[in-house]
Regions:
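Metal-cofactor-dependent catalytic cores
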Residues: 1-264
Length: 264
């Protein structure tokens, strides 16, 4: 196995950037999900998991690192992330602030994604609050653990583009590798170049992969196929449709496109 592609998302729920290499520290991918939009009314982190309010974020793109992170709006305007509050509030129809500080216990709204598929993106559904970054130290706005991986075996089975699942690392698997093989990697050290990761959870899937991503149309199969073929127990969350794998960083360092991937 080897690394097929590497991805970083400087602003949570926006499209990100494809890179030749990533640097990892014990908090995850440096520069990943360092910014997020916060709903000024409720103080909740904006995420397209709640498509009724936030799906337009997936029409925006973010790139860069540190204070140089830039946001490209759907109309083509490019803005510094730290000064994009006004234009993003206008786009979303809700007042937001762009933040680099993840509050303790920060939460997002997460309606049941299968109900979203059944009843529509604008349906007024119950939206339980989910605390983010429960498996991540530091202040990045990741969903759970520091790093997210998915294999080409799983992507080929589902039949969607990798970017819909928003992984950091896409792993090429040999011909004949079963889909959802990531389930079998839990608890086994994962070595990528000089970096060691420890898998923590299968990745539960939400509404995000089914939504429009930039110019890409909706893709309901990105949820339906995992729901049909890979409902698994996710510790602390129940039995959920999953695709991919979360991991924590045991040994930090750089990883590069083409690096070998080994399972302990």
């Amino acid at each position: 196995m080897k690394v097929a592609s590497l991805h970083r998302y400087p602003v949570k729920s926006m499209l990100g950037e494809d890179l030749a290499s990533l640097d990892l520290d014990t908090h995850g991918v440096i520069g990943d999900r360092v910014y997020a939009l916060v709903d000024a009314e409720h103080g909740r982190v904006a995420t397209a998991k709640q498509p009724r309010h936030w799906r337009a974020l997936l029409r925006c793109r973010s790139a860069g690192s540190g204070p140089q992170v830039q946001v490209v709006l759907p109309d083509g305007r490019t803005l510094a992330a730290g000064s994009a509050d006004g234009p993003l509030s206008e786009l979303l129809g809700r007042k937001v602030t762009v933040s680099t500080r993840r509050a303790d216990g920060a939460v997002v709204e997460r309606p049941d994604p299968e109900q979203v598929l059944a009843q529509g993106l604008d349906a007024d559904l119950e939206a339980p609050l989910l605390e983010i970054a429960q498996g991540t130290p530091g202040g990045r706005f990741v969903d759970h653990s520091p790093v997210h991986l998915i294999t080409t075996a799983t992507l080929d089975e589902v039949g969607v583009e990798a970017l819909r699942y928003r992984p950091n690392v896409v792993v090429v698997t040999p011909p004949g590798t079963p889909a959802f093989v990531e389930n079998d990697w839990l608890g086994r050290p994962l070595t990528i170049g000089a970096v060691t990761l420890v898998p923590t959870l299968p990745t539960p899937r939400c509404s995000v992969p089914t939504l429009e991503h930039g110019d890409l149309p909706r893709a309901p199969q990105a949820l339906r196929r995992p729901a049909e073929r890979n409902r698994v127990e996710v510790e602390g969350f129940g039995v959920l449709p999953c695709a991919g794998l979360y991991a924590r960083v045991e040994t930090p360092g750089p990883i590069h496109r083409g690096d070998p991937v080994e399972i302990g």
